[in-house]
Amino acid sequence: MQRIEATLLAHDLKFALVSTRWNHLIVDRLVEGAELAFVQHGGKTENLDHFLVPGSYEVPLVARRLAETGRYDAVVCLGAVIKGDTDHYDFVAGGAANGILNTSLHTGVPVAFGVLTTDTVEQALNRAGIKAGNKGGEAVLAMIETANLLKQIER
C-alpha cells in the first residue's frame, strides 16, 4: 500500500482569507494567527489576500466567488459567532458552516471553516490565541496540507 501525505510548506501556494468585521476584537486575533502560520510555513505575505465581510452569514458567498476565480489554492474563512438568548446564533452558525462546506465541495477548492462558534466571549478569545491555541493558524495549516495533497492527486 502506498501512503500519500502532503507537506506543510506554503512556498508555492496562494490563499485568500475571508474574515468578518463582526466581533473584530476576536477575529483580528484569528487573522494574525492565520498570517503567522502561513509565513512560518514558507508562504509569502503577497500570496495571502485578505477580504473583509460584515458578518459570518456573508462569508460563504465571498468565499465561493474567490474559489471560483481559480486564483487561489485555498480559502480560509474566519469569524466568531457567539451564542446569545435567541435562535439567531443557530441560523448564522449553521448557515455559515453549510455554505462554507458547499463552497468547497462545489468548487473543488479547499475552504476552511475557521469560524468560532462559542457560548461566550471568553471561550472565543481563548480559541483566538489566549489559551487554546489560535484557530486561525490551525485553519491555515489544514489548508496548506489539503492544498498540497490535492496538487499531488492532480499530478
Swiss-Prot record:
Record-stated family: Belongs to the DMRL synthase family.
Function: Catalyzes the formation of 6,7-dimethyl-8-ribityllumazine by condensation of 5-amino-6-(D-ribitylamino)uracil with 3,4-dihydroxy-2-butanone 4-phosphate. This is the penultimate step in the biosynthesis of riboflavin.
Disulfide bridge map: none
Pathway per the UniProt entry: Cofactor biosynthesis; riboflavin biosynthesis; riboflavin from 2-hydroxy-3-oxobutyl phosphate and 5-amino-6-(D-ribitylamino)uracil: step 1/2
Active site: H88 (proton donor)
Molecular function, one GO term: 6,7-dimethyl-8-ribityllumazine synthase activity
This protein's UniProt keywords: Riboflavin biosynthesis, Transferase
Protein name in UniProt: 6,7-dimethyl-8-ribityllumazine synthase
Source organism of this protein record: Deinococcus radiodurans (strain ATCC 13939 / DSM 20539 / JCM 16871 / CCUG 27074 / LMG 4051 / NBRC 15346 / NCIMB 9279 / VKM B-1422 / R1)
Binding site residues for 5-amino-6-(D-ribitylamino)uracil: W22, S56, Y57, E58, A80, V81, I82, F113
PANTHER family linked to this entry: 6,7-DIMETHYL-8-RIBITYLLUMAZINE SYNTHASE (PTHR21058:SF0), 6,7-DIMETHYL-8-RIBITYLLUMAZINE SYNTHASE DMRL SYNTHASE LUMAZINE SYNTHASE (PTHR21058)
GO CC annotations, alphabetized: cytoplasm; cytosol; riboflavin synthase complex
Catalysed reaction equations from the record: (2S)-2-hydroxy-3-oxobutyl phosphate + 5-amino-6-(D-ribitylamino)uracil = 6,7-dimethyl-8-(1-D-ribityl)lumazine + phosphate + 2 H2O + H(+)
Pfam families: DMRL_synthase
GO biological process, alphabetically ordered: riboflavin biosynthetic process
EC number of the protein: 2.5.1.78
Residues binding (2S)-2-hydroxy-3-oxobutyl phosphate: D85, T86, R127
Superkingdom of the organism of origin: Bacteria
Membrane-spanning residues: none
